[in-house]
């Protein structure tokens, strides 16, 4: 059973016909993502799953404006992310996050768990460093 946490149907993130191709040689390209459409609404959580190498990380990097798209459009709160200023990119990344396939490899083993969890909050001025 899916519980609807939203108070309305506010569209937060939308991908339209999102495609990413990589040039692998002079005459060949590899299509990592092909015409993907996605609509995310306020209060919802989404997990992207698939086989290794199917384009999950590429797709998510495009959504976070970390990877240029080959074609298509991405809108965050109704605005085209390709036209975002640096401040708008920074703001959007406070709300769009990615957990890698092996999250254990992403953590610094020399940091305490509390420090790992609070670091992004401190970086985004959501928590004061004590």
Give each language-model segment a name.
Residues 26-27, 81-97, 123:
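ABC ATPase NBD coupling module
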Residues 72-80:
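Conserved ABC transporter NBD signature motif
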Residues 47, 90-101, 115:
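ABC nucleotide-binding domain signature
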Residues 64:
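Helix-to-loop junction immediately C-terminal to a conserved catalytic motif
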Residues 49-51:
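The feature captures the beta-strand-to-loop junction immediately N-terminal to the Walker
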Residues 104, 110-123:
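Short helical segment in ABC ATPase nucleotide-binding domains corresponding to the A-loop/adjacent helical element
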């Amino acid at each position: 059973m899916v519980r609807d946490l939203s108070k309305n149907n506010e569209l937060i993130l939308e991908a339209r016909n999102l495609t990413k191709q990589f040039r692998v040689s002079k005459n060949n390209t590899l299509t990592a993502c092909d015409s993907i459409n996605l609509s995310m609404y306020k209060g919802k959580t989404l997990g992207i799953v698939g086989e290794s190498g199917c384009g999950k990380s590429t797709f998510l990097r495009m959504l976070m404006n970390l990877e240029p798209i080959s074609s298509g459009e991405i809108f965050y709160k109704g605005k085209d992310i390709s036209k975002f200023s640096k401040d708008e990119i920074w703001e959007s990344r406070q709300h769009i996050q990615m957990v890698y396939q092996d999250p254990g490899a992403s953590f610094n083993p020399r940091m305490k768990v509390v420090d790992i969890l609070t670091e992004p909050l401190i970086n985004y001025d959501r928590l004061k460093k004590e």
